[in-house]
Amino acid sequence: MVIMSEFSAVPSGTGQGQQKPLRVGFYDVERTLGKGNFAVVKLARHRVTKTQVAIKIIDKTRLDSSNLEKIYREVQLMKLLNHPNIIKLYQVMETKDMLYIVTEFAKNGEMFDYLTSNGHLSENEARQKFWQILSAVEYCHNHHIVHRDLKTENLLLDSNMDIKLADFGFGNFYKPGEPLSTWCGSPPYAAPEVFEGKEYEGPQLDVWSLGVVLYVLVCGSLPFDGPNLPTLRQRVLEGRFRIPFFMSQDCETLIRRMLVVDPAKRITIAQIRQHRWMQADPTLLQQDDPAFDMQGYTSNLGDYNEQVLGIMQALGIDRQRTIESLQNSSYNHFAAIYYLLLERLKEHRSAQPSSRPTPAPTRQPQLRSSDLSSLEVPQEILPCDPFRPSLLCPQPQALAQSVLQAEIDCDLHSSLQPLLFPLDTNCSGVFRHRSISPSSLLDTAISEEARQGPSLEEEQEVQEPLPGSTGRRHTLAEVSTHFSPLNPPCIIVSSSATASPSEGTSSDSCLPFSASEGPAGLGSGLATPGLLGTSSPVRLASPFLGSQSATPVLQTQAGLGTAVLPPVSFQEGRRASDTSLTQGLKAFRQQLRKNARTKGFLGLNKIKGLARQVCQSSVRTPRGGMSTFHTPAPSSGLQGCTTSNREGRSLLEEVLHQQRLLQLQHHSSTAAASSGCQQGPQLSPVPYVLAPCDSLLVSGIPLLPTPLLQAGMSPVASAAHLLDTHLHISAGPVALPTGPLPQCLTRLSPGCDPAGLPQGDCEMEDLTSGQRGTFVLVQ
């Protein structure tokens, strides 16, 4: 791997102890943007235009001939693509061991990181971004180029938050009717035909990936994911995915038409443009003009921007050499300066939309510094005051010598030598009054490398397991297949052809949500959704934040110190209304349980303690010095009534049954006393208490009226009467009534064991076995 130090040491003879930035050609390297298995990406600034660029530095010594051919093919594809939503290629430099690819720098990074930080997009925002993505992909297809690796990591955002399609490492030429066979791409975005190892049509492959991208933009999560590659493969082949409740019907229809398992039934790019969801915003239709302004980009047709050429000529750069470089697609220093100045001009125009462009100045063999004020582009387009005097100097030779002298200042000895662009005699041709060399090392080595043919598609690839980490976050095949053993193996999807269980259409059924498998809004990152900085409350983070997945989408940045938003909650149904009935039933049940518990449950428990009286199982000292009652054996009537089997009855039925028995017994005893038996003192009903044990006073339980005490009495009516019973609880000691007990009370001796009262009924609230002594049995 190429490792460059950020600064090069200044020779000690200069007397300066500081370090100056590393220079590569006409670029000052500022910092590292990323590193891969065989390349490193640096952020640099052009020394003439002061424009920031991204330089991809590739170590050719670590590439075999097949992978090096892929690199050359990527360069050739980027030379053919000039679109506002595609990363622009500025310059290509090559040495014996190194390859330098200078491209446009997207200031706001990847769409992947944006979703990680802000959550999923609204459908209006997603529609705007998807129009730009669709325009770029359609432009590629019109030039017979297929991308084959469309994903949010390869969608960059410039300073205006516009989409820039990048990374054509898996791109290739295609011809209609001639299928491709290379299995490449990223697992979550790969089409079923790639997993099956079949030949495929390039545009249909990109349409599937576009459907996954649109799903990620709207939902913040992946439609297909899994803990390992076989599980992911099975889900992709089934074509089943979840639909969140907040997705509109039109958006769902569009995604389902793109994510069709059968490639022949999949929607096309032209049909996507005409879909109702895409046509919902008329303003986007006006902005999406296929005949966009390509002035200055169609250099091979002789359509050049005269203002940019005039500025370059005023700076002392040879005009004829610049035109030749543009016509030959050399992408050397001349073309780089031209394209960079053209970008600065467009940025200036977009910053001042009200200003009208003035007519281009008349061609002159040479422009003086005073003539620069007549151009439309002001001097702010060439910033940096320390360098401006040399740029506007009327002496072209002075500029040439200053730039070349600065180039010589580069430290060419030590380990940094292969990283720096070599100084050769061809560089002198950049400026006017210099001889024009017929050939140059910078552009002849990468002019005709890309060749169409089956050899590019029939590459021998070995099946390897999914690595733990790769240069790309979602990649099936890397160009580092035949690198040194220190490099991770490439990722290849199994080539075994498996028949799809559902050919033709995507399944409408929804998978059950699983926190470990499904999107749990982008663990991710997808919420990730680490993915998290400031965001509106309505945006949800990526659902797969912290989830176990074979593809860490929206997970990598989950722990960057930002607040994680809650994951998107997917319902079983397709629409939000599908869950309203279930939620209503749940709320009704909760309210019903609440109302049922608010009345009678405390009293019912106490009634159970009074009605299910028990005998003494073991004599222990009771709490509070409870007095002992000596009672005779219970009457036979009570025994006969309570010997029936009560197994299988509920607690409430037992209480009601015993309560009715007590009331019947009391009624019969009262009638006998009034007919001539021994008359006892007429006492008012006294509370039936278990006083000393719990110091609780339970007021008299009213007896049911006689008409209700019939065999056919409804248990529901008795339950309702019991639930209305009022209990008076007192914490203080209660004096027991003196005098003879009423006939309804019977004293039980400590050793008695009344028949009909099973031992299991010897349990009372707040009364242990040590507190059981003499009890009062309510008859």
Swiss-Prot record:
It is an enzyme of class 2 (transferase). Expressed in lung, skin, ovary, heart and stomach. No expression in brain, liver or adult skeletal muscle but is present in skeletal muscle progenitor cells of the somite beginning at 9.5 dpc. Present at 8.0 dpc in the monolayer of presumptive myocardial cells but rapidly down-regulated at 8.5 dpc upon primitive ventricle formation, although still present in myocardial cells that will populate the primitive atrium and bulbus cordis. At 9.5 dpc expression is down-regulated in the primitive atrium but observed in the sinus venosus and truncus arteriosus. Changing I607A: Localizes mainly in cytoplasm and not in nucleus. Residues 363-373, 628-641 have a biased composition (Polar residues). Its EC number is 2.7.11.1. GO terms for molecular function: 14-3-3 protein binding; ATP binding; cAMP response element binding protein binding; histone deacetylase binding; magnesium ion binding; protein kinase binding; protein serine kinase activity; protein serine/threonine kinase activity. The modification Phosphothreonine is found at T182, T322. Changing S577A: Abolishes phosphorylation by PKA and impairs nuclear export following ACTH treatment. Residues 350-375, 449-472, 621-641 are annotated as: Disordered. Residues 303-343 form the UBA domain. Residues 27-278 form the Protein kinase domain. The modification Phosphoserine is found at S186, S577. Signal peptide: none annotated. Changing S577A: Constitutively active. Interacts (when phosphorylated on Thr-182 and Ser-186) with YWHAZ. Interacts with ATP1A1. Serine/threonine-protein kinase involved in various processes such as cell cycle regulation, gluconeogenesis and lipogenesis regulation, muscle growth and differentiation and tumor suppression. Phosphorylates HDAC4, HDAC5, PPME1, SREBF1, CRTC1/TORC1 and CRTC2/TORC2. Acts as a tumor suppressor and plays a key role in p53/TP53-dependent anoikis, a type of apoptosis triggered by cell detachment: required for phosphorylation of p53/TP53 in response to loss of adhesion and is able to suppress metastasis. The RK-rich region determines the subcellular location. This is Serine/threonine-protein kinase SIK1. It comes from Mus musculus. The lineage of its organism: Eukaryota, Metazoa, Chordata, Craniata, Vertebrata. The gene is Sik1.
